[in-house]
C-alpha cells in the first residue's frame, strides 16, 4: 500500500520506538516485601460484576436473536478497543492509524472499561520492561490469581509506581485522542460500557431492560475482562516457548482464541513491536487478519511493523525451547 503524506490532517507522526523492551539492569530490592494492602472497594465491585455476569449467562437463552447479535458485536468492538487499540496501536506503536480509526478504537476502549488508554499503555509498557519482577503490575511469579485479577484488588507494589513515573510517555501525552479520552473517561465509560449496550436492544427492538443490562452490558464486559486477564495469567504459565525459553510468556492456543489473537505471547514478548504479535499472521489472529490488515487495505491504517522471517528463525534457533516448527 503506498505511503500517505504525514501532512494530511488525519495522520499523526509517531515515534519510532517505545519503552517496551525488557530492562536487564533492573534489580529487585533486597529485604522483606511491602505488605499487601487490599482495596476492598475493588473487591466488592469485581464480585458484584461477576455475580451479575453469571446472572446474565442464566438470562442469555431468553434473549432475542437480535440481542445475541448485538452482544457479540459489542464484545468484538470492546475487545478490539484493547487488542488493536490500547495494546498494538498505543502501547507498542506497531502501526499507524488515521484519526477516524483512532476515535473508533478509543470508543471501543471505553466500552471495554479496563482503565483509560494512557494508563493501560503505561502499565503495559512497564509490564514489558520489567516483566515478572516487583515492577511488573501483574507479576505472574506471584501466582495465577494475582496475575489474573488479584493485582487489581490490591495496592500497587511501590516499584510499579516508581518505574511507571520514570517511563518515557511523551508520545501518549502528545496524542490528542488519548488525552481527550483520559479527560472524559468516566462519562465515556458510563455511555459506552453500560448505557449504549443496554439502551439499544431495549429501545430499538423491545428487549427486556433486565436482559439488555445483564447480557450485552455486564456479561459482555466480564467476558472481555477475563479474556484480557488470561493473557497476563495463563499465557505466562502454560504453553511452549519456541522463541525465547528464558522468559515465562508462552504460546497458548486457548488464550489466542479467547483474546482474538493475543495468545502468541512468547513471540510477543520476544518481538513486542510486531503488529501481528505472531509469526503466523492471520492464523487464529482476528485482530491482525480481520481488522488491522483490513484497515490497511481501506487506507485507515498504515506502516504495520513486522519482523523478518530470517530474524524470527534465527532467534528461535538461538534461544527457543526447540518446539519451533523449523526444528
Swiss-Prot record:
It is a multi-pass membrane protein. A motif (Histidine box-1) lies at residues 87-92. It catalyses: octadecanoyl-CoA + 2 Fe(II)-[cytochrome b5] + O2 + 2 H(+) = (9Z)-octadecenoyl-CoA + 2 Fe(III)-[cytochrome b5] + 2 H2O. Its main location: endoplasmic reticulum. Fe cation 2 binds at residues 127, 236, 265, 269. The keyword Transmembrane applies. Its EC number is 1.14.19.1. A motif (Histidine box-3) lies at residues 265-269. Residues 1-39, 86-184, 231-327 are cytoplasmic. Fe cation 1 binds at residues 87, 92, 124, 128, 268. Residues 61-64, 205-208 are lumenal. Substrate binds at residues 42, 115, 122-123, 155-156, 229. PROSITE patterns: FATTY_ACID_DESATUR_1. A motif (Histidine box-2) lies at residues 124-128. Pfam families: FA_desaturase. Coiled coil: none annotated. The chain crosses the membrane at residues 40-60, 65-85, 185-204, 209-230. Its cofactor is Fe(2+). InterPro entries: Acyl-CoA_DS, FA_desaturase_dom, FADS-1_CS. The histidine box domains are involved in binding the catalytic metal ions. Stearoyl-CoA desaturase that utilizes O(2) and electrons from reduced cytochrome b5 to introduce the first double bond into saturated fatty acyl-CoA substrates. Has high specificity and catalyzes the insertion of a cis double bond at the delta-9 position into fatty acyl-CoA substrates including palmitoyl-CoA and stearoyl-CoA. Contributes to the biosynthesis of membrane phospholipids, cholesterol esters and triglycerides. This is Acyl-CoA desaturase. It comes from Cyprinus carpio (Common carp).
